[in-house]
UniProtKB/Swiss-Prot annotation:
Regions of compositional bias (Polar residues) in chain numbering: 19-28
Coiled coil: none
First-level EC class: isomerase
Chain's role: Responsible for synthesis of pseudouridine from uracil-2457 in 23S ribosomal RNA.
PANTHER family cross-referenced by the UniProt entry: PSEUDOURIDINE SYNTHASE FAMILY PROTEIN-RELATED, RNA-BINDING S4 DOMAIN-CONTAINING PROTEIN
Keyword Isomerase applies: yes
The reaction(s) this protein catalyses: uridine(2457) in 23S rRNA = pseudouridine(2457) in 23S rRNA
Chain residue ranges for the region called Disordered: 19-38
Record protein name field: Ribosomal large subunit pseudouridine synthase E
Top-rank lineage group of the source organism: Bacteria
Length: 217
């Protein structure tokens, strides 16, 4: 069990029951932690329209506006138009554990889509679909209620009044560019809102949008 450094709350491990597969994906290179420095792990609930980096020549919002911690880097990416959990660390081994192939690290997303997916669409997501960069690995996919912990998005999503929306819980074991969005579009239900809830044992539990906390690894 992990303990927060700046919060009295304790982290709850995230269950991946019914979302298990046998193959896992590749990710980017990692950074090494300088010798003799303690491992630092930052959990950040990234708002919409914030880049997952500390600098941007174009002047867009970055992590620097929220996190006054130096020497930590994101494990994987979370697109500017996506929200939710970003794990930052100075430990390359931890980055590898969260992102590299064969590490068996699932990533849970809550996804608001246009329309109500059919069982055939859900089965296609679970079994893998063929995108322009090849077939996806099997994934967890289920229809769920709107999350009780959901925060308002600014700006709100654009939705058509004549078409209902619904929420999916999707668990991936690979990290392709904009993969969730491409997968739901492929089966006919475009993504309207995308929130990453968990990476391995790390989750958004008790972490408000735009807030961060440090945890022990």
């Amino acid at each position: 069990m992990r303990q927060f450094i700046i919060s009295e709350n304790t982290m709850q491990k995230t269950s991946f029951r019914n979302h298990q597969v046998k193959r896992f994906s590749s990710q980017r290179s990692t950074r090494r932690k300088p010798e003799n420095q303690p491992t630092r792990v930052i959990l950040f609930n990234k708002p919409y329209d914030v880049l997952p980096q500390f600098t941007d020549e174009a002047g867009r919002k970055t992590l620097k506006e929220f996190i006054p911690v130096q020497g930590v880097y994101a494990a994987g990416r979370l697109d500017r138009d996506s929200e939710g959990l970003l794990v930052l660390t100075n430990n390359g081994a931890l980055q590898a554990r969260l992102t590299q192939p064969g590490k068996r690290t699932g990533k849970i997303y809550y996804v608001q889509v246009e329309g109500i997916p059919t069982q055939d669409a859900l089965e296609a997501l679970r079994n893998g679909v063929t995108l322009n960069d090849g077939p996806t690995l099997p994934a967890g996919a289920e229809l769920v209620d709107e999350p009780a912990w959901l925060w308002p998005r600014n700006p709100p999503i654009r939705e058509r009044k004549s078409i209902p929306t619904s929420w999916l819980k999707i668990t991936l074991y690979e990290g392709r560019n904009r993969q969730v969005r491409r997968m739901t579009a492929h089966v006919g239900f475009p993504t309207l809102r995308l929130i990453r809830y968990a990476m391995g044992d790390y989750s958004l539990d008790n972490l408000a949008n735009g807030e961060w906390r440090e945890v022990t690894d």
